[in-house]
Amino acid sequence: CPVGRVTVAMLAQKIRQVLGLSLKWFVKNGRSLSAEDAFATLRGCCENAGVVVMLNGIVGDNTHRPLDAQEFRAFALIDEYAPLIFINRTDSRRGQLFSLAHEIAHIWVGAEEIYNDTYHYASNAPVEVLCNAVAAELLIPRSLFNERWQDAVRNCIDAPDAVEVLAREFPVSQVVIARRALDGMMISEQEYQSIVDKSRRHWDVQKTSGGSGGNYYNTKQSRLDHRFLERLAASVSEGRTSYEEAYRLTGSNRKTFPKILDSMGERGR
């Protein structure tokens, strides 16, 4: 849709309708979902709506060639039948969630791009401004944010503390919360920049600490669109797709392909 003909609220509402999301979709049993669970929920809704979502943090299967989140966080490819979103999983969990929401907005707008705004969304490009605003509206609806911010203010919490509190109530980073507050003229530019700088230092420490590589097969199948894997498995079993082609499409082989499918089944139960 043309950028100038749609408002943030209109586009966010259209996306919620198609994906089957409520205004508080990220709240379950009175508590906010973790960024990881919110991502899984939003990804599942995308897949059900026909949007392919794939993740990877390395080049192919080469663990010695990580994708740099400083260079790009995500991208979207627009297609009438199978739009695709790719997420760089070296980014933080909350960063991945915001990137997914941002790319969803791009698909609705109909504009392809590579998203690499690492710490705060300050692009002046009209499409980027719109998509960042829509992503924020999907993850932190303005009406809910204003209500919770006022509650924090009434409890005499200063701006940095209020940002920290709200970052526990919404599945987004403190930077995104702070930007929401800045856009609403609730904090100053100086306060916002201080939060950005603090978050940057914290993320740099997290990156250097590293972590476990996890289960290979769980990691492998989580990179691929679940709907794609299900249909590929069905096509192979029906003889419409050869095993060699399935191996090529999934970057697997005779030994690993069945285990990837088994891992998908276990995670689906």
Task: Please state what every model-predicted region is.
Residues 1-269:
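Active-site hotspot residues in diverse enzymes, especially metal/ion-binding acidic/histidine motifs
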